[in-house]
Amino acid sequence: MQLEKMITEGSNAASAEIDRVSTLEMCRIINDEDKTVPLAVERVLPDIAAAIDVIHAQVSGGGRLIYLGAGTSGRLGILDASECPPTYGVKPGLVVGLIAGGEYAIQHAVEGAEDSREGGVNDLKNIGLTAQDVVVGIAASGRTPYVIAGLEYARQLGCRTVGISCNPGSAVSTTAEFAITPVVGAEVVTGSSRMKAGTAQKLVLNMLSTGLMIKSGKVFGNLMVDVVATNEKLHVRQVNIVKNATGCSAEQAEAALVACERNCKTAIVMVLKNLDAAEAKKRLDQHGGFIRQVLDKE
């Protein structure tokens, strides 16, 4: 697909004279365009749901969720991956973000990195990619060689693959087994796909990782019950989570958390089932860490 024919490279009539308007009007134009992004994502919800189910199946079988992208797309994958351990208590490495050009590229542009097909393949080889893993290729244009080659290599290994792009019929969408293509139209600044396309990608990644964690028992109701308390704010959040899940007092919640080494799931089961920490943990282990199953089946 030629660059000039891509929707993400088109000219946006709504912003054609954005350099001549007031600062407030400038903001209104950008905001009006941003409002269209969730609607574009809404149109591909069935595709997102299908991807979540596949990701969950693979991760449940011992696989990993691997994000692969260049530039803004790569950074968004790294952002999503890096938030999973503290938010959901998963081990670092379960969700992995890879970016063309390596760690240096997180903060700096690395010339030519996105054009390296070898880079996409080698980065996946370096993390020991296996057929159990799911590779999610992220590229607003859908034409990034680094991502396309990575998806091709992943499919050769037998991996399940997902392609996120914002141009219908792109190489990324046709190379991946599952295509997620929110079409957000032309950008406010022509070709600046870090804007609407980047926002759409972030919304999709939010759903993929959050959906995986919900289906993995990391959420009870709407509470992040595997949150790791790495700072004072999260210590307080843990107390509130146990309170909200059980209806107990803050003092009871804190006491339960202290007794079980600050594991929210265990504390919740302790309070709701009137158990000590060891027995609560045992029952959770018997039900794969799902609070709901402990409560419903016992």
Curated annotation (Swiss-Prot):
The active site is at E83, E114. Specifically catalyzes the cleavage of the D-lactyl ether substituent of MurNAc 6-phosphate, producing GlcNAc 6-phosphate and D-lactate. Together with AnmK, is also required for the utilization of anhydro-N-acetylmuramic acid (anhMurNAc) either imported from the medium or derived from its own cell wall murein, and thus plays a role in cell wall recycling. It catalyses: N-acetyl-D-muramate 6-phosphate + H2O = N-acetyl-D-glucosamine 6-phosphate + (R)-lactate. One of its GO terms (molecular function) is carbohydrate derivative binding. GO terms for biological process: 1,6-anhydro-N-acetyl-beta-muramic acid catabolic process; amino sugar catabolic process; N-acetylmuramic acid catabolic process; peptidoglycan turnover. It is an enzyme of class 4 (lyase). NCBIfam families: N-acetylmuramic acid 6-phosphate etherase (TIGR00274), PRK05441.1 (NF003915), PRK12570.1 (NF009222). Belongs to the GCKR-like family. MurNAc-6-P etherase subfamily. The gene is murQ. It comes from Escherichia coli O17:K52:H18 (strain UMN026 / ExPEC). Homodimer. The keyword Iron does not apply. Transmembrane segments: none annotated. CDD domains: SIS_Etherase. This is N-acetylmuramic acid 6-phosphate etherase. Induction: Induced by MurNAc 6-phosphate that releases the repressor MurR from the DNA. Repressed by MurR in the absence of MurNAc 6-phosphate. A lyase-type mechanism (elimination/hydration) is suggested for the cleavage of the lactyl ether bond of MurNAc 6-phosphate, with the formation of an alpha,beta-unsaturated aldehyde intermediate with (E)-stereochemistry, followed by the syn addition of water to give product.
